[in-house]
């Protein structure tokens, strides 16, 4: 049974999103001090986020980039303005993205 996400889960999933590119590099160059379970967990996260991104519409991909992957940190207000949506809609889209990531990485 899949449990619903709570206030503790979202920051963890957001950290996965922010650290995605670093995790990809670690995954590609498996450190010798990483055990198999850690590596399998990392693989699940990397492949799950990649799948969510690739399966998303271009507008959603842009939200992912602006929210979590750009070096410059944009506020929700700026991202919503750039995307032509309300901040409420942006927050909803981000929540949906994180739920998709949670499912794709077997978080829940």
Residue ranges and their predicted role:
Residues 84-106:
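DNA-recognition helix of helix-turn-helix
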Residues 63-64:
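A short pre-motif secondary-structure segment
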Residues 1-55, 78, 105-108:
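N-terminal interaction/assembly modules
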Residues 71-86:
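Helix-turn-helix DNA-binding module
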Residues 67-68:
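Short helix-to-turn junction characteristic of helix-turn-helix DNA-binding domains
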Residues 24, 72-74, 101:
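A short hydrophobic/aromatic micro-motif that marks alpha-helical segments and, especially, helix-coil
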């Amino acid at each position: 049974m899949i449990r619903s996400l709570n206030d503790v889960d979202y920051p963890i999933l957001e950290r996965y999103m922010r650290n995605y590119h670093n995790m990809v590099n670690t995954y590609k160059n498996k450190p010798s001090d990483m055990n198999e379970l850690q590596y399998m967990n990392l693989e699940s996260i990397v492949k799950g986020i990649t799948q969510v991104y690739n399966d998303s519409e271009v507008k959603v991909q842009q939200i992912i980039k602006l929210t979590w992957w750009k070096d410059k940190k944009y506020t929700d207000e700026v991202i919503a303005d750039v995307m032509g949506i309300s901040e409420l809609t942006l927050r909803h889209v981000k929540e949906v993205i994180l739920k998709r990531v949670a499912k794709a990485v077997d978080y829940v």
